[in-house]
A protein has these predicted regions:
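Short secondary-structure transition hinges
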Residues: 45-88, 94-95
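Secondary-structure edge/capping motif, primarily at the C-terminal ends of alpha-helices
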Residues: 18-22, 48-52, 111-114
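A short secondary-structure junction motif
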Residues: 11, 37-47, 82, 107
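Active-site-adjacent scaffolding segments
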Residues: 17, 26-32, 36-39, 43, ...
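Hydrophobic alpha-helical segments that form the core
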Residues: 37, 90-110, 122-134, 146-153
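An amphipathic alpha-helix adjacent to DNA-recognition modules
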Residues: 1-20, 31-35
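C-terminal peripheral helix-coil segments that are non-catalytic and often amphipathic
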Residues: 73, 77-80, 84, 116-164
Length: 164
């Protein structure tokens, strides 16, 4: 499962898709990366069907390691770019670049912290407000809508799986 997910990420890396764009500032690149990631249906379907990570500590450790090695440096580069171009105003680029992948891959994972779609959306809003207060106003209405759709689809898939 990890190798398939890694290959899918490499083939359709939303960070690489925005890195070289000169028409976007750092903040806009992060928002666009989130939009691209949310629109990647194959990866989302795989996430919905992924094994419960709490039952396999190796999967959990591998996910945390991949976040640290892969996602954190991408977030750091984009946050620093935003600091330089003035679209982001934070003293915590490194800390935020480490925290965002942990929050989005663990805290928002219903297999780790069971939650309804409404509860996940509430958590997502909390993350958005926290990031905003830290000088990284990344969650806009469009991204909030994408997250809501994703959480509702996940909840529907879980309900369907429970009926089978």
């Amino acid at each position: 499962m990890d190798a398939v997910g890694d290959r899918m990420f490499e083939e359709n890396n939303p960070f690489e898709a925005v890195m070289g764009r000169d028409d976007l500032n750092g903040l806009e690149k992060i928002r666009e990366m989130i939009r691209l990631n949310q629109s990647d249906r194959d990866r989302q379907d795989m996430n919905i069907q992924s094994i419960p990570i709490l039952k396999n500590p190796r999967v959990l450790a591998g996910m945390i390691d991949a976040n640290r090695r892969v996602l954190t440096p991408y977030f750091y580069r984009l946050i620093e770019e935003g600091n330089r171009d003035g679209s982001i105003h934070t003293e915590y680029a490194r800390e935020l670049s480490e925290l965002i992948p942990i929050l989005t891959s663990l805290w928002l994972a219903p297999s780790v912290f069971p939650a309804s779609a409404e509860q996940m959306l509430h958590k997502f809003r909390f993350i958005g407000e926290m990031l905003d207060r830290m000088g990284l106003p990344v969650i806009d209405e469009e991204i909030l809508g994408l997250a809501e759709s994703h959480f509702r689809e996940f909840e529907a898939a879980e309900e369907k799986r429970a009926e089978e």
